[in-house]
Structures are given as structure tokens and as C-alpha cells.
Amino acid sequence: MSKDIIKEYGNVLHDPASITERPLEVLSVGPKLDIALGGGVPEGSLFIMTGPEKVGKTVTALTFCANAQKHYERKVYYANIEGRLKKRDLQGITDLSLDAEKMQIIGSTEGNILSAEKYLSIIDNIVHTQPGSLAIVDSFSALSSESELTGDLSDMQVMSVQKVLAKFCRRISNVLPINRVTV
């Protein structure tokens, strides 16, 4: 039986004695949030920051990116869904050692508007193939599903973004801690 499982799925069977604890690093977001979170955000987790417009969520996310690069040497991916991230925002964070050259911005371009499915597929790919990275999604509330972007405005039978997000979260939840990716 064991040989059949290994043949079909690879080396997925482990002796209980071989299981070791891999302590997860706690990544610094910024001083105030670190205090509120008991030190920061554990790597390999999905961290959602909410709040009204113009309270500093994007600046906090960029500070998180700078800390991830500076202190933990993380690859950083930033999904600029709202399209509001500007060069001046990145320049304002250079004092915090954000290396914009080592950061990948994911965003729609003229003639190529990314749907929720496409954005989340890109992030899903990062989660599965870029261990130890940090992926920022700015912001979930700006996501529009493919059917919302291309469908008839009178058609109420569209796949909601909430369903897309739920599927995305289920897909990545077990992979995040194994690959130590923080979203």
C-alpha cells in the first residue's frame, strides 16, 4: 500500500519521528501594528488589513514590503488592483529602504484589464512557486470578476467576487505555511 501511494503521489508518507517543528518568522509590519499583533505577522499567513479610505493602508503595506526586503530578504509582489499606486508612493518609502527595483508590481495595462480571476491566479502562482515571498493585494474590494467586466450589465447571473475569493483562500490556505509565503 505504501509503495503504491509513493509511486502515485511522491514521497508524502512520513514517519512520526521525522516531523519537526519549523518555527515561522514573524514579519514586522510597522511599530503600531506590530504591538497590536504581538510582534508582527507570522510568515505563511493570510493577513487582511481593513479600514476606511485614506487612513494609510497602502503606506502600511509598502512599509511591510520594505521591512520584508530589508530584514528578511523577501521577494515582494504587489498587486496594484486599484491602480492608485504611483511612483511617488514608492519614492516616499525609500527612506525605509524599499528597493523598488526588487519589487514586482502586478497590474492592468491599457487594453489588458485583469479580472479578479486573473489577479488571484497570479497570486496563486506566486504562492505555489515563490517560497518565502510576500504578496500584497491592494485591494480585495476593487476586484471585479470576469463576468462582471465582460458580461451584460442586465445579467444578474454573474459569479460574485466573494465566490472567487473563497475559492482562492481555500486553494492557498494549506500552501502558505509550507512555502512560507505571506499574503
Residue spans of the language-model regions?
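Intrinsically disordered, low-complexity linker/loop segments enriched in Gly/Pro
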Residues: 79-82, 98-108, 140-141, 148-149
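The Walker A/P-loop phosphate-binding site
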Residues: 1-100, 115, 120-128
